Design a protein with these regions (language model features):
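Bacterial Sec-dependent N-terminal signal peptides
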Residues: 1-32, 225-229
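Glutamine-centric residue-chemistry signal
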Residues: 22-24, 74, 105
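Structural signature of Gram-negative outer-membrane beta-barrels, strongest in the C-terminal barrel
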Residues: 97-113, 117-136
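N-terminal capping/interface segment
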Residues: 2-4, 9-10, 48-50, 54-62, ...
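Outer-membrane beta-barrel channels and translocator barrels
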Residues: 24, 66-70, 115-119, 182-184
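Extracellular/periplasm-exposed beta-strand and loop segments of Gram-negative cell-envelope proteins
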Residues: 39-53, 81-103, 132-174, 194-222
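Residues on the lipid-exposed face of transmembrane beta-strands in outer-membrane beta-barrel proteins
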Residues: 31-35, 57-67, 77-79, 106-112, ...
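Short glycine/proline- and aromatic-enriched beta-strand/turn motifs that initiate or cap beta-hairpins
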Residues: 22-60, 166, 228
Length: 229
């Protein structure tokens, strides 16, 4: 029992010392995770009754390098599932279209950190991100053919339409705020994509009018936690 108590006290002390040491270190390595809430808006050719919240994931790792007493530059690698879900109106009635895109994303952020105590701090950061889609699928509910189907958007096109596909890249702005407790931190952030992800070739596919969509950009926010080494 005495050994267990000693071990627990040692772990607590190490965490506290780790937080103090990190405040003085020139760089920090971190990992974090969060659910990603996508608010992407689909601009349509036809009427859309409702754009719905789409929940994905966000997993990240990277390094922050101090460039001043309070300022730092950070970069890393993030994997995120972004997408869009909306209700489509057709002569046959309503149905849902869900777009799932899995991105590998590289942010380049500039941030400011304030150490409130040796183990408690807060920071805000922002900068551009560059993303590449590793894969994407589109799920069609009971609308056009009254059956549910799933398509690979790079091979089959959206809803099987060769003239409607998604672009693999995205460029946008990321902003994030963190509150640190020793080696742990909580975070809230947002991604705003600038690229219209939808690539249409209306001349080659007259059926595109059924899709009812002519633009889509990635917009999302997240609330999660991370650990700093």
């Amino acid at each position: 029992m005495t050994r267990l108590r000693t071990l627990l006290l040692s772990l607590v002390a190490l965490c506290a010392l780790g937080g103090t040491a990190q405040a003085q270190m020139p760089l920090r390595i971190y990992v974090d995770a969060a659910p990603l809430f996508n608010l992407s808006h689909a601009k349509t050719l036809q009427d859309v009754s409702e754009n719905k919240l789409f929940v994905g994931y966000r997993l990240g790792a990277g390094v922050d390098v101090n460039v001043g007493k309070m300022m730092y530059i950070g970069s890393g690698l993030t994997f995120a599932m972004k997408g869009n879900q909306y209700t489509f109106l057709s002569p046959k009635g309503e149905g849902d279209i869900k777009i799932y895109s899995h991105y590998m994303q590289i942010p380049i952020n500039v941030g400011v950190r304030l150490n409130l105590t040796p183990t408690i701090g807060a920071s805000v950061e922002a900068g551009p991100y560059f993303a590449y889609a590793l894969g994407a699928t589109v799920s069609q509910g009971k609308i056009l053919d009254d059956i549910q189907k799933t398509y690979n958007v790079y091979k089959d096109g959206i809803l099987g339409m060769d003239g409607a596909k998604l672009k693999r890249y995205d460029i946008g702005l990321v902003a994030k705020a963190k509150v640190t407790f020793g080696s742990w931190y909580g975070m809230v952030g947002a991604d705003m994509g600038f690229v219209d992800e939808l690539k249409l070739d209306e001349k080659n596919d007259p059926e595109l009018e059924k899709l009812g969509q002519k633009a889509m950009r990635n917009t999302s926010f997240y609330l999660g936690a991370g650990f700093t080494f």
